[in-house]
Design a protein with these regions (language model features):
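Local cysteine-cluster metal-coordination motifs and their immediate loop/turn environment
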Residues: 60-75
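N-terminal [4Fe-4S]-dependent radical SAM core
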Residues: 11-58, 105
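Residues at the beta-strand->loop junction immediately N-terminal to the Walker
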Residues: 58-60, 114-115
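Conserved non-cysteine loop/helix-boundary elements of the Radical SAM core domain that shape
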Residues: 75-186
Length: 186
């Protein structure tokens, strides 16, 4: 992380000139790349400053319609584990209730519900999940639900997402080539 070097040197009280000289002389970084490091470090500092007292939440739904050939994530095939999704939501609600105590005085900047494929939940389960988020956490600035598999999206699920103020969905078909989709299990 080259920009971290710049940030660390700023924290040590070094001037931009001193940092630039050290990067070129000691680390053999080209002047153009040093300028890029300063730019990235400055942007990073602003983000870190603005992020004080804020948290981002990731809520994992480890179920998918099928297990894709290439997948390295922890996910479970719905055909095999379909009966476990309600029990998973029960456990998730207990965890949300417990964790919400720690976040009650913090500003939640973003919530990302990922997976697996969260939209592999049926409509009732998706409604339950988003209602739990509403119950335990304040409304974030950014609210995303991963809908990675287009075959899991229905008009009703989109209505549920909108009702719960989800501002963005992430759709990833991987490819538009049906032969490839068949090969990888999608």
């Amino acid at each position: 992380r080259p920009a971290k070097l710049v940030s660390d040197m700023w924290a040590e009280g070094k001037s931009d000139f001193e940092i630039r000289e050290e990067m070129v002389r000691k680390f053999k970084v080209s002047p153009d790349k040093v300028s890029l490091m300063f730019s990235v470090a400055s942007s990073e500092q602003k983000i870190l400053k603005d992020g004080k007292g804020k948290v981002s939440l990731y809520i994992g739904i480890p179920f998918c319609p099928t297990r894709c050939l290439y997948c390295s994530f922890t996910s479970y095939d719905m055909k095999r584990y379909n009966g476990k999704m309600d029990a998973y939501l029960d456990a998730l609600e207990k965890e949300m209730a417990h964790c919400s105590k720690y976040y009650q005085y913090k500003k939640i900047s973003s919530i990302y519900i990922g997976g697996g494929t969260p939209t592999s939940l049926n409509e009732q389960q998706l409604e339950r999940l988003l209602s739990m988020v509403d119950k335990y956490y304040s409304r974030p600035q950014e609210y995303t639900v991963e809908a990675g598999r287009p075959d899991t999206i229905t008009r009703e699920k989109l209505r549920i997402l909108r009702h719960h103020n989800v501002g963005r969905i992430s759709i990833n078909p991987q490819t538009l080539n049906q032969k490839t989709l068949d090969l990888i299990g999608r």
